[in-house]
Each structure stands twice: as C-alpha cells, then as structure tokens.
Amino acid sequence: MKNCNIIRTFFRSLLLQAVWNFERMQNVGFLYSIMPCLKEIYGADENRLKNAAIRHFDFFNTHPYIANTIISLTLILENEKVAPTGLPSVASEEIKSQQIKSLKLHLSGPLAAIGDTFFWARIKPFCGIIAAGYVFVRGINNINYFLVPLVFIFSYNIPHIFFRFFGFWLGLKYATDVVKIISNFKFQKISEIIRIAGIFVCIFVLVVYLMSSVKYQFIGVLLFFVSFVLIKKNVSIILVFWGLVIGCVGAGFLM
C-alpha cells in the first residue's frame, strides 16, 4: 500500500465517530477510514471492491482511540488476500474474509473495555484535575480563563493522539501478532498509577491552596505531613484524600 493512502486512512480515522447509527454503530466511519486503501488494493475490480465495502459496512463498535489498531490490522489482512498479480486469491478469499470479520468482532469488545477504563475513567479525570489544580495554584484572572481550557486540551490530547498513532503503527507492523503485543501491555498497572497520581495532585493542590493564605499555612503543612505518614503506613490513599477534605471543611467551620 502507498504511504499516501496509509496517511489518508489515519487522518480519516479521526472521523470514526462522525456518523453514528444505533443499528451498526461506527460502521460508516470504519468504512470511510479504510476506503482509500481498499481502492488501491482492489484496483479496477469494482465487483470485489463493492463486496469488500459491503463486508466492512457490517456492525463495528469499539473505543475510538484504540480503533486504529483494528483499522490498520484489517488493511494488512485485506492486502494479504491479493495475489502478486493484483487479483485476490479466490481459493482463500472467503476464508480470509471470515478471518477478518472474526478478528474485528473479537478485538472490538476487549479494546473498547481497555479504552473506556484507560481514557474515560483515568486519563480524562486526571487531566481535568490538572486543569482545576492550575486554577487553585495560579489563581483566577483574565489570562487563566483562557489558559485553563488549553491546559486540559493539551494534557488530554497529547496521550490521546499518541495512542491513536501508536496503535495504527502497531497494526501495520505486526499484523495479527498485535493481539499478543496488546495483551502484554500493562494497562491495569498504568491505570492504577494514574489514579494514585490524580489523588496526589488533589492533595498537593489542596495543601498549596491552604498555604497560600497566612491564616491556613500551619494547617496546610500539617495536612501534608499527616498525609505523607498515613500513605507510608499503607493507609488507602482514597481514605487519606477524603479525610483531608473532611478535615479542611471542619477546620473551615472552626476557624
């Protein structure tokens, strides 16, 4: 496949969710993404191109940021169906078509679960915490009204775009071996690290906010050291965080 068509496919994949329907979900976006490469693979054979388009117009639904792995893997498998002469191998065409359909179906579910957990439940809240923390640390003024949304947009979209590109590259390079590579990724461990980091950022922002006022400086320092000691003693970081919140609210009423 030509590099220009591969690049076009990648940029088209950004529009995967531009057209939704409740019957087949992301099927229109999927077919739109791979169409440039399908046209190159099948050339002037309009009948086989039409059959391929109908085949990929079937149900498809996964996490949009990790869908690129399935898209590039599908293109590799479609390309392998074509003999050196440029015509599909009739003997193996039906078998490979079923293999492609099966891989799309069996990969879409697990990848959707990984993406939902990693991006919706971890990355997005973490970037929101960073943006909110920026307000508490830097204060609210006319400049920060514009900077805070930019902090969130950049902190979220850098990993998001990276995973789109990296997943697309993995599918092109490793084909069906990408399944084994993805299974070896420690998504659960990384998600847990992000969760803990997010709570630490919340604690840090809370302490900095308290210390910004002379009246609450002592409380800020005290809460920081208490949090550090409790975490060192393996107390749940979530309990530490909510303890800090309740403590701050109580201190506010007392003072």
Predicted regions: what they are:
Residues C248-M255:
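Juxtamembrane boundary at the C-terminal end of a transmembrane helix
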